[in-house]
């Protein structure tokens, strides 16, 4: 079945395949490098770099599906998509915590420690799941 992002009139020429190989290799190598950095420094910035690299791999893949065996390609694409979703979940909690901290500081209000504690617990669990999937990927 054709995916919504497949471009119907693209042709699988030798030059196009060669370009696809070069671009995807570059994008995947870059992603692996950012994943390695993420494991050394579990910061918001390194998570952001991994998220950008995942996006670049995924969107490049969408252009080049016609160049590869569709079954294998989609399996790899789905792994990249899962990692992108998981990294987004971690980022969502980071943003929530930033917003809570901003509201507290800016409005001089107090909130229950339980809220921050629960958000941090959720972040920890999501990060662990994300790291596990990254390890499987690499």
What are these regions (language model features)?
Residues 1-138:
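Cationic, histidine-enriched alpha-helical/coil surfaces that engage anionic ligands
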